[in-house]
Amino acid sequence: MKQNPKISLIGSGNIGGTLAHLISLRELGDIVLFDVTEGVPQGKALDLMQAGTIAGSDIKIKGTNDYKDIEGSDAIIITAGLPRKPGMSRDDLISINTGIMKTVAANVKKYAPDAFVIVITNPLDVMVYVMLKESGLPHNKVIGMAGVLDSSRFNLFLAEEFKVSVSNVNSMVLGGHGDAMVPLARYSTISGVPIPDLIKMGLSSNENIEKIIDRTRNGGGEIVALLKTGSAYYAPAASAIEMLESYLKDKRQILTCAAHLQGEYGVHDLYVGVPIMIGKEGVLKVIELQLTAEEKALFDKSVEGVKKLIETIKEMIKSYY
């Protein structure tokens, strides 16, 4: 019998539990569900395994508090960290979650140095950078979940605006995973027709699209304000699954993710949301879009925001220099 891929989920909160459920339903691989809180991953694993009997899934799920159980993982998704609460920006979490990420990175380096790693923990662009520097993994094997989620929000709002199926919408969001992200209407389409062309046809207006762009930028904050006790987890989990599946199945999908740039877009040694091709070797290629002067200015502003955040935690990162 062919052995299933081993997928470890670091963090068993709302996103971690949802990830485990989706992986089980899609039968992408056997799961290790890790958390520092005793009983939580074990309880969720048992619940999910019982749910799997109803769905007909034979996926094995192990709950654990021991990092050694992630040994030999093919892929790891990291959600561990403090979640956002009302009034908090993603960036408010930086100090606490940097410490958590350093611990996770050390254990990934020790037990699963060949894994493909997807980081979800906020502030995303900084946390995935910490993971790279502290783990020493190759940059093509460490990415952050950002643009797929941001684009999913943009897709929904555009589908509602144009009254079409979400399956007809394909949007593009670049930059940091924060309030300065750059939703690109020019690279977003409805069944292949660019948004600016649809505006010219009278199907929407520049004003409406700008409102949608602003709502997309605040998409996570809108959910935090409504929930009051936490942040989004269904869409972030679904976004990470799309990235994971492209890696495990060598689908070579082009997805917008936080990728480590080494000169692309004029950016050096930073994680920024850009389109990348994901296959069995990890990041196969960074896709460089031709941006207008206005788009490039917005992108550069977003990059500067990421740089400033990195500066605030560089003393905590041993490999920064």
Curated annotation (Swiss-Prot):
SUPFAM superfamilies: LDH C-terminal domain-like, NAD(P)-binding Rossmann-fold domains. Substrate binds at residues 84, 90, 122, 153. The active site is at 177 (proton acceptor). GO terms for molecular function: L-lactate dehydrogenase activity; L-malate dehydrogenase (NAD+) activity. CDD domains: LDH-like_MDH (cd01339). Catalyzes the reversible oxidation of malate to oxaloacetate. NCBIfam families: MalateDH_bact (TIGR01763), PRK06223.1 (NF004863). Belongs to the LDH/MDH superfamily. MDH type 3 family. This is Malate dehydrogenase. It comes from Rickettsia peacockii (strain Rustic).
